[in-house]
Amino acid sequence: MRKAILALAGTLLVSLTAAACGGSGSASATQPTGGGATTAPATTPLPVDAKPFPIDPSEFTTEIDNPYWPMKPGSQWVFRETDAEGSVSRVVVTVLDKTKMIANGVEARIVHDQVTQGGQVAEDTYDWYAQDADGNLWYLGEDTTEYENGKPKTKEGSWEAGVDGALPGIIMPASPQVGMTYREEYYKGHAEDGASIISTDALAKVPYGRFENGVQTRNFSAIEPDVIEEKIYAQGVGVVLEITVSGGSDRDELLSYSEG
C-alpha cells in the first residue's frame, strides 16, 4: 500500500477538537498534549502480525461510513507528495461505484489511487476496502502497477486477502484509542504493514485547511524496519497528512477533498 506534518526532532506534533477550518498554508502539526486521549483496553480485538483472525464475510459492507475515513462513491482526495529529493507528485484517490468479491469471501469497495509525475502516470492502484458490523475499516488488498517512462514496470506489492496466505488488516478502528496496535496488511515478503494509534487529538494544517482532534497513527513495516511514517486522519474527511519521520522525509498533504 502506498504511504507517505512536518517533523520536529524526528517526531510529529499534535493538539486538541475535529473540524476543518478553510484556508491554505504549509503542512504542520503539534505535540501530544495528553489530555483528551483515551487508552485502548488490552482486550480490544484487532488483528496483529500474521496471526489468524476470524472474520465473517456476512458481517461486512461496502457502505463505508467510518468517521475517520468515510468512503462514499464519488468522493475524491487530491494530495501533493514531496519526496526526499524534492520531487513533487500529484496523488488522486477516488472512491469508485464498483465493488470486488475478494477471495476470502468479503465484498469490497474499490478505490482508485493514481500517482502522476510531470503529467505521466508513475503508479496506478486499485485498493479494496470494506467495513465490518462494528464499524472497523478493513483493507483487503490491492492491484498496483508501477510505471517507468510511461510503461508498466512492476506489480510488486499487489496482494489479495485469501490468496497465497495473504491476510486482511485494519486501516481505521471503529473507536480509535491511543495504544491500539494492529495489522494493516499481510502478504509475507511483499506487504507486512502495521500501525499504532499515538494520539486522538492531533492538529494538522495543510493546504486544504486546519483540522483538530485528528487520529494520529505511527506506521511501520517488517519489510522496511528502518522506515517509520506517521499519518493524521480528520473526522469526516480521512487522511489529511502523512510524513516519513524515520528512514526518509517524504510528505503527503491534502490539497482538496470532495464528498461523493
Where are the regions that the model predicts?
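Bacterial N-terminal signal peptides that target proteins for export
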Residues: 1-9
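C-terminal motif of bacterial Sec signal peptides marking the signal peptidase cleavage site
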Residues: 16-20
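Conserved functional acidic sites
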Residues: 22-27, 32-260
